[in-house]
């Protein structure tokens, strides 16, 4: 029987959204999590659902680490864009800065798990499922050096 997420106990499992035609199983991680919108429920997937790089290598970046490993800033990450996009296959990516690069087979480690041609993560979610998601501001640390 369907229930409101807010009525479920922490660690309860729920099916919400889908990936490759299969429902995604989530665990209720917390309710009214500090720093998140009021009356919100935080979900985390029950298991790893996809292994993707955080960001593609950026060969034209002036920072040698970012040339070889991609950008470590969440705001610029390919993964952030993909996870938050309902766009069709190959349409979710937009360059976030002048050296940004798509996560295609030439710019991910050993060509493993490129995802530039995939649909956005939210693409297979229903309109009602997407409407139930809350916008959240993620605060991350940035080195002062």
Each language-model region and where it sits:
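Collagenous Gly-X-Y triple-helix signature in extracellular proteins
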Residues: 1-145
């Amino acid at each position: 029987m369907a229930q409101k997420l807010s009525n479920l106990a922490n660690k309860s499992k729920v099916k919400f959204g889908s990936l490759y035609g299969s429902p995604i199983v989530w665990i209720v991680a917390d309710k009214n999590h500090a720093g998140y919108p009021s009356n919100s429920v935080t979900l985390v997937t029950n298991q790893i659902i996809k292994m993707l790089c955080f960001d593609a290598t950026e060969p034209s970046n002036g920072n040698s680490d970012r040339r070889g490993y991609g950008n470590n800033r969440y705001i610029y990450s390919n993964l952030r864009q993909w996870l938050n996009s309902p766009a069709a296959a190959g349409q979710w990516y937009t360059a976030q800065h002048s050296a940004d690069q798509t996560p295609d087979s030439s710019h991910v480690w050993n060509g493993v798990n490129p995802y530039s041609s995939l649909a956005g993560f939210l693409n297979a979610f229903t309109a009602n499922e997407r409407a139930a998601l809350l916008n959240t501001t993620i605060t991350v640390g940035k080195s002062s050096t």
